[in-house]
Each structure stands twice: as structure tokens, then as C-alpha cells.
Amino acid sequence: MRFIPTRYHAPLDYIVGVVLIAAPWIFQFSDNSGPTVVSIVLGAGLIAYSLITDYELGVWKIAPMAVHNLIDIVAGAFLAASPWIFDFADDGAKVWAPFLVVGAAAIFLGLTTKQTGGYRYRKGGAHPTAAAG
């Protein structure tokens, strides 16, 4: 069931993107290149695909929200699994826990955020239920 409006999802994307980029220094694992690269690349990627998403805080509004949600699910699974994929799961919880927690949260948001809403409907587009009612 999708119950999270895009207006709440959109700001979280940018906040989490910045946190992922800063995570190596926040959680003090910047001396470990594997998790540092994964965190920075996925944080920058999240910001990049948020900029092209057709939602409230998208700049270019190219990608539909359904595509954004799918990317969230795939990226979240990759993020959660990355401590084992890149062999840094034994480096301590301060290194692997942020990847697991943020990855699980991304999967949750991808599965529960509405596929439509927000921007398009405030700009005069027809709401999907308006045609049916």
C-alpha cells in the first residue's frame, strides 16, 4: 500500500543524499576507501535522479515517480548489501550500519511512496480519480 505523499519523499531524497555524501566523515570511516566511495557515489546519484524526477522538488521533471521509486528500491538493496559486496562488513557497526539502515529505509520509501501526486496536480493536470468520479 502506497501511503507516503511525494511532498514528504522529495525533501528526504536531498537530505539523505547529502548525509550519504557526508557519512564517511560523520561516522568516521573516511580512511576506508570502499565504503567511502560507495557512500559518496550513491549519495550523488540520489541527488542526481531526484533532480530529474517529476515531483515537487524535481528541477527538470523528466523521470516519472514510478521510475524514481524503482530506483530507490534497487539502490536501497545495493546500499544495504554493499558491506558484504565490497567486503567491509567486518569493519565494525559504525561502518556497515549506516549502509544497512539507509538501504532499508530507501527500500521502504520506494515501496510505500505514492506513484503520482504533488507537482503535476497543483499545476492544473487532471487528478487520476477525477476522471473516474
Could you tell me what each predicted segment is?
Residues 35-68, 108, 112-121:
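A low-complexity, Ser/Thr/Gly/Pro-enriched, surface-exposed linker/loop concept
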Residues 16-36:
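Membrane-helix boundary elements
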Residues 81-98:
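Membrane-helix boundary connector in multi-pass membrane proteins
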Residues 97-108:
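Small-residue-rich transmembrane alpha-helices that serve as helix-helix interface/gating elements
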Residues 1-7, 30-34, 56-66, 90-93:
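Juxtamembrane loop-transmembrane helix junctions in multi-pass integral membrane proteins
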